[in-house]
Amino acid sequence: MNINPYFLFIDVPIQAAISTTFPYTGVPPYSHGTGTGYTIDTVIRTHEYSNKGKQYISDVTGCVMVDPTNGPLPEDNEPSAYAQLDCVLEALDRMDEEHPGLFQAGSQNAMEALMVTTVDKLTQGRQTFDWTVCRNQPAATALNTTITSFRLNDLNGADKGGLVPFCQDIIDSLDKPEMIFFTVKNIKKKLPAKNRKGFLIKRIPMKVKDRITRVEYIKRALSLNTMTKDAERGKLKRRAIATAGIQIRGFVLVVENLAKNICENLEQSGLPVGGNEKKAKLSNAVAKMLSNCPPGGISMTVTGDNTKWNECLNPRIFLAMTERITRDSPIWFRDFCSIAPVLFSNKIARLGKGFMITSKTKRLKAQIPCPDLFNIPLERYNEETRAKLKKLKPFFNEEGTASLSPGMMMGMFNMLSTVLGVAALGIKNIGNKEYLWDGLQSSDDFALFVNAKDEETCMEGINDFYRTCKLLGINMSKKKSYCNETGMFEFTSMFYRDGFVSNFAMELPSFGVAGVNESADMAIGMTIIKNNMINNGMGPATAQTAIQLFIADYRYTYKCHRGDSKVEGKRMKIIKELWENTKGRDGLLVADGGPNLYNLRNLHIPEIILKYNIMDPEYKGRLLHPQNPFVGHLSIEGIKEADITPAHGPIKKMDYDAVSGTHSWRTKRNRSILNTDQRNMILEEQCYAKCCNLFEACFNSASYRKPVGQHSMLEAMAHRLRMDARLDYESGRMSKEDFEKAMAHLGEIGYM
């Protein structure tokens, strides 16, 4: 059954019809195969924008470095990265004058936050490049392998608990003549094959110690792993994204926190706020511009698009920015903030899996790993790849990586780059001409408002803004930016026309079935519709249609049509039998073939609660029986989070209310993982989970209050248990023998 998404637009006012131009239903495109080509594209493009800069060879890594700052003055129409440092600093000076004390306060707050940040902050985050095994791992695992390897080199800062001592270790590690670390190696064993002649070669993952030289270690620490960005709609070509390693993460975190403190107090910044708060900020900006417009004058808005934002920015500009922002801070904090940009201006991009080539007879395929890209004759590649490799050659290192000193990778310094954009917007006017500009910036997206007495002066203002941005390394695209009278523009996928236009078509892909389990999917579906009514101006008739479409989709997904429907099938047989034997058929869940009772008034109520009072007692008993092996009470208590994928922008986390019943099952993890080197990771995770459960059993508040202190977990638990035992013994809740037994056990642990 194909559902026509246009049903959703029945009661939409005419200007909101923008929604109909986004018929994004269905699965977005995912990337397949190797991402090497996209990464090489990024490396080549980035260097092309900076190619007139100073070139030199790094004395540490031997890589080719390019520094475009203070390069030739930029030209119109060509994107370039030649930011002029004195212009950047002057723009920041003006920002400092306009917001007195903002830089000092932001630095002070960031410094105080850094002092109390613990190492475990680095466990937040998804994939992280792990230098010990040279591939991506979950952030927590990468941090763990780094800390255990650091201990082998007498670097024990992490044990103190704070982020600062751990970061000090990272700096010290870069000076060690060699680094010893644990890695995973596959040992091949020959075993006689059971069912045929000959041998089987079995790979056994082993944890082994290894050592690398200082230069090799520094190269790994500076490496960014690259992948292809998935699920991007509206583009023919995929593009590369990067993942930094643990050494860079801690320093980036502090710089981003500093920039966040500043963005929060800049009225032109679209970060770090979101949703309705961002809309309020936008509406205020529009109102302010219209009220400042000269009598009889004109106010224009440019919906802006920047060409290759990341590739034209430069870490050296960010270094200048952190130095300027932290000007009045203690020297240690200024040094700390300067490390991230310095590491980034020496970064090295890993190129991924390499290319596939076929033999001349087209019979055999072979994967050429990145270190060997230039070891085979170039004519073996197709023309496109050959052209790429020729351009890549000067920046290629023999390990199969590429030197990438200019440019930033996606999503690394969103806040700090926003500060740079806002600095350009804050200049407002050049040479006291008769226009004023202002605007909004959110990472690489911007909207520019210009007020002047007539259209020509407005255009002059826009051109001046364009050239101002050029001096900061920002390239506004003349082709993709367009200008309207103020009152109609788009900023971060929010469309404005005398107020925000309801734009729930963006959310259409997330109106489907989430695929967690029957119980959660129903809750998520209804919550999304509810949220769209609250936040995105979805009207009642539309919402009603959305409910019906969702229920249809849900029934098709889980093959659970109404008990009185004519649909056949294995599951329907069981459902029909249940339907026949049930008195209160309204009480059956939709997943059990019951009717849908959802309407606009009860979207916020979980289905089990909605139908609780009209269920047959025996059905209710089966559905909610705590001893029923399918009722996952422990795993589903209270509020749960789901990942929602809108058509635009990142995956969002969304809370929904969960009530556990027999439909709240959890799928088992894929068993095939048990024979890989990931197995150790799972065992470690289970070990951590047990430790944390033990700790929470001793300290009930640990689940909602972060424990602070310098004790190890073991000492803290032993101490707490001794206290509890003594209290129980003294109050008579515990016998003398039990008390002595408990004390003896605690003594055996070695902490008495």
UniProtKB/Swiss-Prot annotation:
Residues 249-256 are annotated as: Promoter-binding site. It comes from the Viruses. It catalyses: RNA(n) + a ribonucleoside 5'-triphosphate = RNA(n+1) + diphosphate. One of its GO terms (biological process) is symbiont-mediated suppression of host gene expression. Keywords: Eukaryotic host gene expression shutoff by virus, Eukaryotic host transcription shutoff by virus, Host cytoplasm, Host gene expression shutoff by virus, Host nucleus, Host-virus interaction, Inhibition of host RNA polymerase II by virus, Nucleotide-binding, Nucleotidyltransferase, Phosphoprotein, RNA-directed RNA polymerase, Transferase, Viral RNA replication, Viral transcription. Its EC number is 2.7.7.48. Gene3D superfamilies: 6.10.140.720. The keyword Nucleotidyltransferase applies. Belongs to the influenza viruses polymerase PB1 family. HAMAP family: INFV_RDRP. This is RNA-directed RNA polymerase catalytic subunit. It comes from Influenza B virus (strain B/Lee/1940). The lineage of its organism: Viruses, Riboviria, Orthornavirae, Negarnaviricota, Polyploviricotina.
